[in-house]
């Protein structure tokens, strides 16, 4: 009985600690950085699944933009809503873990925010509007994709 209680309390404590970091809502960003308004936020004002990912890069925005141009290629050019050089790319995206033929009903922005002349914050925000069971599935997909998102950001 004591071992079971210890395990349960450890799991609850771990879950609380994880939730306190903002996971899975945000990774690599402070709460104030995640609260910044980004392009595309008004395209889906009723979004109830909002996920922010970020990493500070020791390079100016122009260099980061060039690297993104070499490694980033959307699967379908029609999903791109707007491109502002050295600032952001805004696109339509399907919900995480959605079937391949699912409509791109959400938005995703990849924004470059200068922290200093030689340091840039790469901020990725994904927004979806989902209800009921679908919302739970989207959050499950977000949580499952979080580790790969973090790995991708670190590889940049």
Protein language model features and the residues they cover:
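Hydrophobic transmembrane signal anchors and adjacent membrane-proximal interface regions, especially
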Residues: 9, 81-83, 152
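Hydrophobic ligand-binding cavity/cleft-lining segments
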Residues: 5-79
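N-terminal Lys/Arg-rich, disordered targeting/topogenic segments
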Residues: 1-2
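Beta-strand/loop substructures that line and gate deep hydrophobic ligand-binding cavities in soluble
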Residues: 33, 93-156
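Short, hydrophobic/aromatic-rich segments at coil-to-beta transitions
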Residues: 83-92
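Short strand-connecting beta-turns/loops that link adjacent beta-strands
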Residues: 60, 86, 115-118
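Hydrophobic/aromatic beta-strand elements that line small-molecule binding cavities or substrate pockets
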Residues: 53-55, 78-82, 106-115
């Amino acid at each position: 009985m004591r071992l079971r209680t210890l395990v349960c309390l450890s799991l609850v404590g771990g879950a609380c600690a994880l939730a306190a970091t903002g996971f899975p809502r945000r990774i690599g960003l402070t709460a104030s950085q995640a609260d910044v308004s980004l392009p595309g936020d008004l395209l889906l004002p009723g979004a109830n699944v909002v996920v922010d990912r970020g990493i500070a890069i020791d390079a100016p925005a122009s260099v980061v933009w060039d690297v993104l141009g070499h490694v980033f290629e959307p699967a379908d050019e029609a999903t791109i809503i707007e491109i502002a050089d050295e600032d952001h790319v805004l696109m339509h995206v399907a919900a995480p873990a959605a079937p391949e033929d699912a409509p791109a009903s959400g938005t995703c922005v990849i924004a470059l925010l200068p922290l200093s002349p030689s340091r840039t914050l790469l901020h990725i925000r994904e927004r979806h509007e989902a209800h009921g069971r679908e919302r739970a599935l989207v959050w499950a997909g977000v949580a499952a994709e979080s580790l790969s998102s973090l790995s991708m950001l670190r590889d940049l």
